[in-house]
Amino acid sequence: NNGPVELGLGATQTPWDNRTVTWVTAVDTLNDLRPWPQPGAGPVTSIGTTVWDPAEGDSAWFELDSLQVEAWADTADVSRGARIESLTDNARLQVSRVVLRLDTRPSSNPDTIIVLSAQRDEISFVYDPIPEAPENGIRIGGAPAWRTVLNVKIPTHLDGPAELCVAAGGCPLELKPLELNYAAITLKSERGEQAFQPTDSIGLDVRQVLRRDALPKAPLGESLTGLLGQRVGPDAFGSKSETDIEIPITEFVRDLLGSQDGMSPTKTLALLSVFEPISIAYASFHGPGNENGPVLRLVVTVGRAMELP
């Protein structure tokens, strides 16, 4: 946002789950669905307002009294939390860090001021209306976090290209795990809704769905992309949309090629954000069913059988 924004702070009164919270739902976990008494994380006990002006810095402050600090220090209160809301229309802000700063004066030494800082435990975003699910697209990230599930078709034999058939001495060629050097899903980015355009890099993660019959809350395997995931810059969903993004899945494909009958792992992958949720912005890609849809890229090394004299 380019101009001043008025912000309001209130103390929550209802228990909520940071991974599943929405504008109307405080908790939406397995066998536990609880709505907010008031849509929008309400009701709250109003604490105060402040104005953030980007021309004056990147931080905003709310003044708290000792009673509110004491209430938030009660770890037995599962409803404790704070709602920060924008009171300015047509403004979009991303809260990257929240700190509770305490200036205390010990009774034993009243001439001394001690400054303490407490980091936040959980954070999420609620808003209304939530964008409609894409009719034939892939969406990753946002808050609540969007995920996309793909069934991957792994070929057991290759019939081309012609250069491969010549190198192998003919086709079809059986695809073996040891001959696979690299495998990746290639996604083509697209421009999403303006209000949800990423302004920072997004870390894409890929995990194997361990039980497809348990979707949409199926358990997932370990990350196939590492700690930080596959990083994609924000321009890929704006000025540089239609960019090809590769997400390596080599070990996943090797495991499928090497699996035995009756012990085949699931061929379903979940595409998600590394950190969920981190902002309302999400990544958009073209979905299956058209020329810009996901593509499986394979790099193999093959050689002809040779006979020694």
Across the structure, where does each feature detected by a protein language model lie?
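Secreted, disulfide-rich extracellular signaling modules
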Residues: 1-309
